[in-house]
């Protein structure tokens, strides 16, 4: 990744000079570009593995359902980039891969997802130290998290249960990331 870090630094320096950015703005621009590049590679690796295992569509459905809720609900993050890769691959590739081959009762997944809704109602949005949520946005984000969760839940009742299980998996995983056990105690 050193090559990409150097290119990011070069481009951020270019933008700093061109737009007369101070040091803090330079750091913000550089961090933003690092996040974009890092996420691009995580997506590339995750979806490449899903294509290799022939579960691309199921990975996509799971991931999109997850992201629809996460956008407003936020939630815990992996402690390092490598752990994020591992968690993403396990959650969005291998769990769908096994779901295809294991007969899990749809009613069971639906019941777990309804319990997950309780987690969203109680804990969303879940701020982190690195990503605090402004107080003025908390109520709106909670409301939108609940609405999106309910929409995905209702949609899962309408579509074929085989595909719905991946939608439920996505929202269930997101509801788990909201639980306080994943957040360190504040001092």
Curated annotation (Swiss-Prot):
UniProt GO cellular component terms: plasma membrane
GO molecular function: peptidase activity
Keyword entries, A-Z: Cell membrane, Hydrolase, Membrane, Protease, Quorum sensing, Transmembrane, Transmembrane helix, Virulence
Bilayer disposition of the protein: Multi-pass membrane protein
GO biological process terms held by the UniProt record: proteolysis; quorum sensing
UniProt xrefs under InterPro entries: AgrB
Coiled coil ranges: none
Membrane-spanning ranges: 49-69, 82-102, 106-126, 144-164, 166-186
E.C. numbers: 3.4.-.-
Domain of life: Bacteria
The keyword GTP-binding belongs to this UniProt entry's keyword annotation: no
Main location: membrane
Keyword Chloroplast among UniProt keywords: no
Family in the record: Belongs to the AgrB family.
Protein name in the entry: Accessory gene regulator protein B
The organism of origin for this protein: Staphylococcus aureus (strain JH9)
């Amino acid at each position: 990744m050193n090559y990409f870090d150097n290119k990011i630094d070069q481009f951020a320096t270019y933008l700093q000079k061109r737009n007369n950015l101070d040091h803090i703005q330079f750091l913000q621009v550089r961090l933003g570009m690092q996040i974009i590049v890092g996420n691009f590679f995580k997506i590339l690796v995750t979806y490449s593995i899903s294509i290799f295992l022939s579960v691309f569509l199921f990975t996509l459905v799971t991931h999109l359902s997850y992201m629809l809720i996460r956008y407003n609900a936020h939630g815990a993050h992996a402690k390092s980039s490598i752990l994020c890769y591992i968690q993403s691959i396990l959650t969005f590739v291998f769990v769908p891969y096994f779901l295809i081959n294991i007969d899990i009762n749809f009613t069971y997944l639906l019941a777990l997802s309804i319990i997950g809704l309780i987690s969203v109602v109680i804990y969303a949005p879940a701020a982190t130290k690195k990503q605090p949520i402004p107080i003025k946005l908390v109520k709106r984000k909670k409301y939108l998290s609940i609405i999106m969760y309910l929409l995905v839940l209702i949609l899962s009742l309408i579509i074929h249960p085989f595909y719905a299980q991946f939608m439920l998996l996505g929202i269930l995983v997101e509801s788990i990331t909201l639980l306080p056990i994943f957040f360190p105690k504040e001092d």
